[in-house]
Design a protein with these regions (language model features):
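A short gly/proline-enriched turn/hairpin at secondary-structure junctions
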Residues: 188-196
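Active-site rim helix/loop that mediates acceptor-substrate recognition in acyltransferases
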Residues: 21-56, 197-218
Length: 320
């Protein structure tokens, strides 16, 4: 039996229900105690329930939310949202299909043109339920987590870079965008034919701008003779940091010009980002490279992750 929750007081057993849910995005980080996962999940659910723009559906053993995304809506030019599926051990295909069907029906009725989601690549039941309701494969990312000590590469192999690595300034904005336009041609936003021209560029532009303004995090650049050779942006993950003093910093965009990739520029940038993040209280650092971005994966292999998890990204367009 499905039930839409519109008031937090209507979910009487919310705390006990949350304890059986497997889908906390950070549950695979063992250093976070169980109460951190619990508090994070409850805050996330509370936000979905209390906003009139969102949907919160609960079944016997699972929860599904649809959260309006201002960021995606502004970039896409149409109403967009993020679907989250929270499963317990007792998940079933039939129940999952019904849950996603009801959620997408609500999204269509409320004029959501675009929905996206991420799901553990091992969750076959959830993936099939999404595909049965017109979600299409978009990408696979590998979430790698390491600590400060593991993130600093003491021995860097390659052609030693002589570039200057520094914090980016607002004057670098145009140069960074020029690099990103040359490099990011394989992102899921570029590859999805349903997106209009320029959508991926607007997404990347917004990420870079917020990093330069330090609204979300920070950005480092590699410079030589007044020309930029690469950049690296990172953001504080405020969702989980609100519940733990062990702060998590998430890598976002990084790129090095093709003719300079044999050098150590990317690893020099990584070192700078990790050291700076650590000075700001960061303990855990998370990378989310695409599973087929082999160049980044090869570089990250020099920094063995503490934890690794594969996630599938799926997109759904209305009437597709």
């Amino acid at each position: 039996m499905l039930k839409e929750i519109k008031k937090i007081e209507d979910f009487k057993n919310i705390e006990s229900f949350a304890k059986k849910i497997l889908a906390s995005p950070y549950r695979f980080i063992k250093e976070y105690p169980s109460h951190v996962h619990q508090e994070h999940l409850l805050k996330k659910w509370q936000s979905s329930i209390e906003s009139e723009k969102n949907l919160f559906l609960v079944s016997k053993d699972s929860v599904c939310t649809v959260d309006h995304s201002t960021f995606d809506s502004e970039a896409f030019g149409k109403k967009s949202g993020i679907l989250n599926l929270f499963h317990s051990v007792k998940k079933s295909q039939k129940e999952s299909d019904k849950l996603i069907k009801e959620a997408t029906k609500w999204a269509d009725e409320n004029n959501f043109s675009f929905l996206q989601t991420r799901i553990d690549a091992q969750n076959i039941v959830g993936i099939r339920a999404l595909e049965n309701n017109k979600f299409n494969y978009a990408d696979i990312v590998l979430r790698s987590i390491f600590t400060y000590e593991e993130g600093i590469t003491h021995e860097i192999y390659g052609i030693k870079s002589k570039t200057n690595v520094r914090l980016a300034e607002k004057k670098d904005f145009g140069k960074i965008l020029n690099i990103s336009k040359k490099i990011f041609k394989n992102s899921r936003f570029h590859k999805d034919p349903n997106f209009p021209d320029g959508f991926a560029e607007r997404i990347h532009e917004s990420w870079v701008e917020k990093s330069l303004n330090q609204e979300r995090g920070f950005c480092f650049v590699s410079e030589e003779n007044n020309s930029l050779c690469g950049f690296f942006t990172a953001a504080f993950d405020n969702e989980i940091n609100e519940h733990s003093s062990d702060r998590l910093i998430r890598f976002e965009l990084s790129a090095v010009l093709p003719m300079r990739r044999a050098s150590t520029i990317w690893l020099d940038l990584l070192n700078a980002v990790v050291r700076h993040g650590y000075s700001k209280g960061g303990k855990f650092f998370e990378g989310r490279p695409q599973a087929y971005n082999y160049q980044i994966l090869q570089r990250q292999m020099k920094v063995p992750p503490k934890y690794l998890k594969a996630e599938m990204a799926l997109h759904r367009m209305k009437n597709k």
